[in-house]
Amino acid sequence: MTVTGIIAEFNPFHNGHKYLLETAEGLKIIAMSGNFMQRGEPALIDKWIRSEMALKNGADIVVELPFFVSVQSADYFAQGAIDILCQLGIQQLAFGTENVIDYQKLIKVYEKKSKQMTAYLSTLEDTLSYPQKTQKMWEIFAGVKFSGQTPNHILGLSYAKASAGKHIQLCPIKRQGAAYHSKDKNHLLASASAIRQHLNDWDFISHSVPNAGLLINNPHMSWDHYFSFLKYQILNHSDLTSIFQVNDELASRIKKAIKVSQNIDHLVDTVATKRYTKARVRRILIYILVNAKEPTLPKGIHILGFTSKGQAHLKKLKKSRPLITRIGAETWDEMTQKADSIYQLGHQDIPEQSFGRIPIIIKKERLN
């Protein structure tokens, strides 16, 4: 049986994700972000609810990306996720993209020219952000063009880079429905951005989100729930440069900006520059919120849930892979578990996110 990996956030899970799962082949293993997202924000709903939605709509196994994989720039996000999926035996990686191109060719380009491509990055001006530098790199070495508004396409290039030398087949699937950033409600396949924008429109949500009750009936989280915590952390921290990726310049800008900022958007707009993108600033603010220091990654793979078919696959792996199905007295990943505790502080109705939780099991096989 073909084993297909998918890297996802499902923030939240919607019809476009269901389409991706239905289109992908074989047994589907999802490497999913935890309670904080790659672009630097809290998950709309917690990781367990998102896992359940995925498992009820085509996924066979959902594993958690550790905090220091989830909340990273595209290259590190892709590398960490693919490393985990390879341990779980995937043969191919399926992903949605705005531009279906020959990603397999890009893997070969990077395999042959990785040293030259990396060296080229170091020659570019420091005034450029890292995403801008990598886009120029791909344009020069592979002739790839960018519109600047295609985040899934950019992630696809990071997947190609991370897949070099791993013998993985990349399977791009054309993104259907609304564009990534679209807030338009007039689409059967509405974007996650539109869903987050219109959570109070039950008719829209019920048509856009499979198992919509799981979304509607659980706490909806955003930066608003954590901004006061963040402000406290910034104002009371003696040395912000001890936080991951915070240099002297950023520490000074953040300390100054927090005194006049009333919300996260104002703070990000004030701190961001051409060099420090808004996404990077948001990630750094997450690092400050959870007091993240030097990154370490766990050896074990945390299983969030599985179907009967997924369980059979995991049984084949458990003797040779460090699979974690319950976090008890021994920690799985200290940083992820600390981040979970802070996420839980945002709302009194969010249940325990780590200790004692066992995987969600969907025993009934899907009919499709």
UniProtKB/Swiss-Prot annotation:
Cite the EC number. 6.3.4.-
Molecular function terms from GO: ATP binding; ligase activity, forming carbon-nitrogen bonds; tRNA binding
Keyword Cell membrane found = no
What domain of life does the native source organism fall in?
Answer: Bacteria
Going by the UniProt record, its keywords in alphabetical order are: ATP-binding, Cytoplasm, Ligase, Nucleotide-binding, RNA-binding, tRNA processing, tRNA-binding
Q: Does the keyword DNA-binding apply?
A: no
| Family according to the record | Belongs to the TmcAL family.
- The name of this protein is tRNA(Met) cytidine acetate ligase
Record organism: Streptococcus pyogenes serotype M4 (strain MGAS10750)
The gene that this protein is the product of is tmcAL
